[in-house]
Amino acid sequence: MSNPEQFHRASRRQLLQAGAAGVAVLAAPAIVRAQTGPKIRIGFWPVAAGLPFFAALEKGYFKEAGLDVEPLKFAGAQQVMEAMLSGRGDGSANGTGTANLAIGEIAQPGLFKIFCTNPSNVKYVLDEFITGKDSAIKTMADLKGKRVASGPGIQNTTLCKTMLERAGATGATVTELPIGQHVASLVAGQVDACYTLEPTGTIGRMNGTTRVIEAGVVAKYILGDPMAPWHGGAGSLTTEFIKKNPEVSKKFIAAYARGVELVRTKPDEARQFMKGYTAIEGPLTAEVPLASYMLYNEFKPSDIAYFQKFYDLFSDKGIFEKKVPVEPLIYKA
């Protein structure tokens, strides 16, 4: 079993390996590091798990490496994947649903490589069910026959329906709704609960309108262990981009790894960079729980196994038309 403390703290050696490709360029004179390479278009959607990417942008890590990175904001992870499929995007930031990415892999085998995931669980929270502050709903089982909203796309809806089923909440109806509307829909009484991702739960809690029913739900109900790492989101680059720009790709991943390192070692400094990229602002950023992060060179066999178990849910349910092996999708330097 993967220990969350282990997957939260990378060894210095692994971080140095991930960052090694960027050392030479970061030491080069500014004139050498001028942004002359290709534009790197990275899709994201407004969830807290994208923090290493937001931090790397705002701290100037990409610019320091001489990279021209363009963040592309989408309403959901499905659109991020579609942009990669159509050639309008070169990769994804953390938080982009790994099941959404897998659908792209099925449509176009060899589409992308994952260089960083954001494992979450009951300790490192990203996923949760929330309800109105004064609601009578106390447990997941209380959602029996209720109206539940989930984030958009096949990953969110499949997980939401499966978790409700496994928690004994039979007869619940699930509706897709952008996560930015989850708190408002609960306040307006349009739904009884939402399966959502941070920072939504924090926003509702801090403005006194919603509360969490249960957090870290995917690890518990899908993977069978509240402390299991759910590799539900990932930073990736398209294989086409990597092949055309191998050195630029290494520099990009090295600069991105600096964002991961900042989140790991200085979370309070990093949190502020959610502002402008997610729906959370100002002092509220200090309240958001953070997911963990795992770089491509930090995966252990147990991590691959839990990641595979997550993917197998979608093939077992017929959402994926075939089994998608995880290991070949992980970037190799």
Language-model features: locations:
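Pocket-lining segment of extracytoplasmic ligand-binding domains
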Residues: 97, 181-273
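N-terminal secretory/targeting leader peptides
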Residues: 71-73, 79, 208-211, 233, ...
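Sec/Tat signal peptide C-region and signal peptidase I cleavage site
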Residues: 30-34
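Short, glycine-/small- and polar/acidic-enriched structural segments
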Residues: 35-167, 173-177, 185, 192-198, ...
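Secondary-structure end/capping motifs
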Residues: 242-319
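Conserved C-terminal helix/tail region of periplasmic/extracytoplasmic solute-binding proteins
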Residues: 311-333
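Short, solvent-exposed loop/beta-turn-alpha elements that line the ligand-binding surface or hinge
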Residues: 64, 122, 217-228, 294-304
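N-terminal secretory signal peptides
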Residues: 1-11, 21-25
